[in-house]
Design a protein with these regions (language model features):
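N-terminal Rossmann-like NAD(P)+-binding domain of SDR-like oxidoreductases, especially those catalyzing
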Residues: 1-190
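Short beta-loop-alpha junction of Rossmann-like oxidoreductase domains
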Residues: 142-144, 195-198
Length: 198
C-alpha cells in the first residue's frame, strides 16, 4: 500500500477511531497503522466482514465494543484516559437515510448523544488535543455537488436533522466548554469511494 502522508507525524501517535469496523473507520485504521500510529478502535459491535478483510490481526492496540448512546459508555472513559489518546476520529454514526426514516429515535441517540459523549471525553481528556468529527453533505439546506463550507445549513428529513444537530452540538462545545489548547475539525462528505464521490 502506497500512502502519501507525514509518517513522522503519525509514528507512535495514540489515535482513537470510533466506528472503526465501518467503511471509513476500517480504511482509516489500516492507513494509520501503516503510518506507525497506535490505533485504538471503538464501535458498538464487531463487524465479521471487517475481520475477514484484514490480514494483519494486530492493527489495533485495543478495541472497545460499546454503544456510545447508553450509560454503559461512561465505563470506558477511565480506560480511554489510561491509554493517553492524543487524536480522535469520530466516525461512529447511524449513516443511512432510510434507517433514520424508520427508526428516528435510535438515529437521534446514536448521532447526537453518541457525539456528545465523545465531545465530553475529548474536553475532559488531558492527553487528547485534536478531534475530527464526520457529519455529512446532507447538513446543507440545499444539498448539491457544489456546496461550499459557508453555505447555509439545514435539514429535510430525520437523518439530516440528526447530523445538523450534531454540528450544532460541536459549535456549542467550541463556544462554551472547549479548552483553548484543543481543536475540533468537521468533515462533511457524501458517499465515499462509490457513486457520487465527494
Amino acid at each position: 500500500m502506497t500512502i502519501k502522508a507525514n509518517k513522522k507525524f503519525w509514528e507512535n501517535k495514540k489515535v482513537l477511531i470510533t466506528g472503526h469496523t465501518g467503511f471509513k473507520g476500517s480504511w482509516l485504521s489500516l492507513i494509520l497503522y501503516f503510518l506507525g500510529a497506535e490505533v485504538y478502535g471503538l464501535s458498538n459491535k464487531k463487524n465479521v466482514n471487517f475481520y475477514q478483510f484484514i490480514e494483519d490481526k494486530n492493527i489495533f492496540k485495543k478495541e472497545f465494543f460499546i454503544d456510545l448512546s447508553t450509560e454503559e459508555s461512561t465505563k470506558i472513559k477511565k480506560e480511554l484516559e489510561k491509554s493517553q489518546i492524543e487524536i480522535i476520529f469520530h466516525f461512529a454514526a447511524q449513516s443511512l437515510v432510510s434507517v433514520a426514516y424508520n427508526f428516528p429515535e435510535e438515529t437521534m441517540k446514536t448521532n447526537i448523544l453518541g457525539t456528545y459523549k465523545i465531545l465530553d471525553f475529548f474536553n475532559s481528556s488531558i492527553s487528547a488535543k485534536l478531534l475530527t468529527i464526520s457529519t455529512t453533505d446532507k447538513v446543507y439546506k440545499n444539498p448539491s455537488k457544489n456546496n461550499k463550507e459557508e453555505d447555509m445549513l439545514g435539514f429535510n428529513e430525520f437523518y439530516s436533522f440528526s447530523k445538523y444537530m450534531k454540528e450544532n452540538l460541536i459549535q456549542l462545545f467550541k463556544l462554551s466548554k472547549l479548552s483553548s489548547n484543543k481543536n475540533i475539525n468537521i468533515i462533511r462528505s457524501g458517499n465515499v469511494l462509490g457513486a457520487w464521490d465527494r
